[in-house]
């Protein structure tokens, strides 16, 4: 069963904020993936879900993408996600990519890895590095 968020939501737990951003797209289910921002004293982490560059730009045009410390790459590092506009706005120092080893889709895509290198991001990948833990 899928549940759709109808509006943005902010949850606060002490000094940690959890922002849930929504957009409305009729292009595909992936474009309606929730975008989640963990905003803490020491580290801001952005997760854009399975959105493509189109969905990422929807968030950008709505003013929902701040600068962050860590970005979880969109759609497992596919070539159509984690676009240059998103990287320029978010300016992440670190990018984590969740992808299975030897997956059928070839994630993460070489184009995405090159974009991340061009932006000077430190990249961690579950297919290569295993479980990723972020501590600050």
Outline where the language-model segments fall.
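Non-globular, low-confidence helical/coil segments that flank catalytic cores
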Residues: 1-136
């Amino acid at each position: 069963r899928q549940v759709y968020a109808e509006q943005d939501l902010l949850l606060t737990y002490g000094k940690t904020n959890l922002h849930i951003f929504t957009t409305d797209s009729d292009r595909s289910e992936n474009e309606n993936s929730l975008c989640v921002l963990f905003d803490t004293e020491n580290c801001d982490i952005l997760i854009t879900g399975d959105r493509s560059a189109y969905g990422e730009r929807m968030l950008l045009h709505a003013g929902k993408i701040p600068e962050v410390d860590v970005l979880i790459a969109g759609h497992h590092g596919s070539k159509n996600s984690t676009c240059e506009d998103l990287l320029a706005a978010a300016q992440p120092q670190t990018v984590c990519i969740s992808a299975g080893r030897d997956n059928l889709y070839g994630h993460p895509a070489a184009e995405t890895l090159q974009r991340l290198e061009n932006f000077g991001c430190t990249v961690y990948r579950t297919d290569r590095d295993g479980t990723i833990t972020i501590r600050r």
